[in-house]
Amino acid sequence: MYLERWWWSCIISQSCSLDFAASLDDLSFWASLSWISKSVRVGLIFSNPSGAGLDLLVFMRGMSFCEVSFASLDGCRGVYIDDESLRKFFFFFQYFTFRCERQMYYAFKSQRSIIVKVPTTTRVIDLVLVVNVLSL
C-alpha cells in the first residue's frame, strides 16, 4: 500500500549532484551520486533492497528528445529538464503525472536545471525519464 515517500536533492556543484529517496511504507531507500556534463550524466545508485546500480544518461547537443534509461531505482521516477524549457514542458509534466496515475510531483530548482521527482508504486524496475532541451 502506498503511504508516503520523500526525496532530498542537493546540487553539490554545477557538475555533481546528490539525490536521496526513502519510502515509509516498505522502509526502502535509494541514493544516487551523479556527475553531470553537457553531454553525459553518470550516476552511482545504491538502493535497498535492489542493491547497487549504474545510471548512465547521454544527452545529444543541439537536439530536443526524451530518453528513457533503466536503472535499479525503487520507488522514484526522475525527470530532468533545462531551466529555460520549464514553461514549454509544464503541461507535459501534468500529462505525465496523470497518465502514470500519480497524484503529485516535487521540483527542485538549481541555477540551471529543475529536477522533478514523481512518486511511483512500481515494485519491479523503475525508469528514469530524461527530458533535455539544448539550444542550437
UniProtKB/Swiss-Prot annotation:
Superkingdom to which the source organism belongs: Eukaryota
Additional detail: Partially overlaps BUD31.
Protein name: Putative uncharacterized protein YCR064C
Source organism of this protein record: Saccharomyces cerevisiae (strain ATCC 204508 / S288c) (Baker's yeast)
Phylogenetic lineage: Eukaryota, Fungi, Dikarya, Ascomycota, Saccharomycotina
